[in-house]
Amino acid sequence: MLPLTYVVKAFSIGLFFSLFLMKPLISWLKKQGFQDHIHKDHCEKLEELHKDKAYIPTAGGIVFVFASVLAVLLLFPIQLWSTWFCIGTILLWGALGWCDDQIKNRRRVGHGLSAKHKFLIQNCLAAGVVLPIMFAYKESFLSFHLPFLGIVSLPHHWWSYLLSFAIATLAIVGTSNSVNLTDGLDGLAAGAMVIACLGMLVVACTNGAPWAFICCVLLATLAGSCLGFLRYNKSPARVFMGDTGSLFLGAMLGMCAVLLRAEFLLLFMGGIFVLESLSVIVQVGSYKLRKKRVFLCAPLHHHYEYKGLSEKAVVRNFLIVELICVVVGIIAVFVD
């Protein structure tokens, strides 16, 4: 079969899995009490703006995990260790988000794992992902695809492996948290992920990395499942992906960038995620240093809500920005 056949099959698995499993999943989540309680510390205005979202089922992102496992089992050779590496990675990152949503559900105050504990677990999981890739890729792990510049290789020294390991770990953890920050409006994170995954898929299909095929299948599955999820997550949302979905999606996108040796390309392919994270970093840094806020509220999408833009307008504009970033990213790959 041609690689395109695998891509179409993976996309179809993700799409139909989300479309047909989501309805019974929403009913089950309601029965289990997985509901968004819209508790925002020191953000009374934000609670007021989002009061209509209270008690909407959350943790719907578990469908992305199921779809990804199914796609890997159906399309990857079962005897290869890389197949089980993918399944283990998918399940562990899915479990992290699920546990976080479980804790939120039990406490019913909008808080799950503490930021420190979550960050520590994320780094451990990311390291567990990067190390096998580093040993499998060997010298290839020292090469990076820099936008507009092409392939750049580091010298074969121990510090090169350490630097490459740090960059790869940062890409996975950073993207995971960035998608999590972006998941604050109906259809925003899922819509941006569809665009980002399709953009990275174009890169993966033309990439010569050892495990590029794995990326093609995963990215196509995620794009399809996010597209199907949008039917239920677009405004007015009937379900949220929760941390189960956002942490998982970001980690998978980051892992694919690592596999393609294209971590720096995430600056374009995940452009809107980068902007959301930067807005939080700038906001927190400014307040700690100057006791002044740069934005009315962070992440960035809430800033525009505070300025009076409707939720649909913010989502539409952000998705346009993400599309532009992805187009620039694709151009950056092929012009070098």
UniProtKB/Swiss-Prot annotation:
CDD domains: GT_MraY (cd06852). It is a multi-pass membrane protein. GO terms for biological process: cell division; cell wall macromolecule biosynthetic process; cell wall organization; peptidoglycan biosynthetic process; regulation of cell shape. Keywords: Cell cycle, Cell division, Cell inner membrane, Cell membrane, Cell shape, Cell wall biogenesis/degradation, Magnesium, Membrane, Metal-binding, Peptidoglycan synthesis, Transferase, Transmembrane, Transmembrane helix. PROSITE patterns: MRAY_1, MRAY_2. It holds the Pfam family Glycos_transf_4. Pathway: Cell wall biogenesis; peptidoglycan biosynthesis. GO terms for molecular function: metal ion binding; phospho-N-acetylmuramoyl-pentapeptide-transferase activity; phosphotransferase activity, for other substituted phosphate groups; UDP-N-acetylmuramoyl-L-alanyl-D-glutamyl-meso-2,6-diaminopimelyl-D-alanyl-D-alanine:undecaprenyl-phosphate transferase activity. One of its GO terms (cellular component) is plasma membrane. It is found in: Cell inner membrane. It catalyses: UDP-N-acetyl-alpha-D-muramoyl-L-alanyl-gamma-D-glutamyl-meso-2,6-diaminopimeloyl-D-alanyl-D-alanine + di-trans,octa-cis-undecaprenyl phosphate = di-trans,octa-cis-undecaprenyl diphospho-N-acetyl-alpha-D-muramoyl-L-alanyl-D-glutamyl-meso-2,6-diaminopimeloyl-D-alanyl-D-alanine + UMP. The keyword Ribosomal protein does not apply. Its EC number is 2.7.8.13. The chain crosses the membrane at residues 1-21, 56-76, 78-98, 124-144, 148-168, 184-204, 210-230, 239-259, 264-284, 314-334. Its cofactor is Mg(2+). Belongs to the glycosyltransferase 4 family. MraY subfamily. Catalyzes the initial step of the lipid cycle reactions in the biosynthesis of the cell wall peptidoglycan: transfers peptidoglycan precursor phospho-MurNAc-pentapeptide from UDP-MurNAc-pentapeptide onto the lipid carrier undecaprenyl phosphate, yielding undecaprenyl-pyrophosphoryl-MurNAc-pentapeptide, known as lipid I. This is Phospho-N-acetylmuramoyl-pentapeptide-transferase. It comes from Chlamydia trachomatis serovar D (strain ATCC VR-885 / DSM 19411 / UW-3/Cx). The lineage of its organism: Bacteria, Pseudomonadati, Chlamydiota, Chlamydiia, Chlamydiales. The gene is mraY.
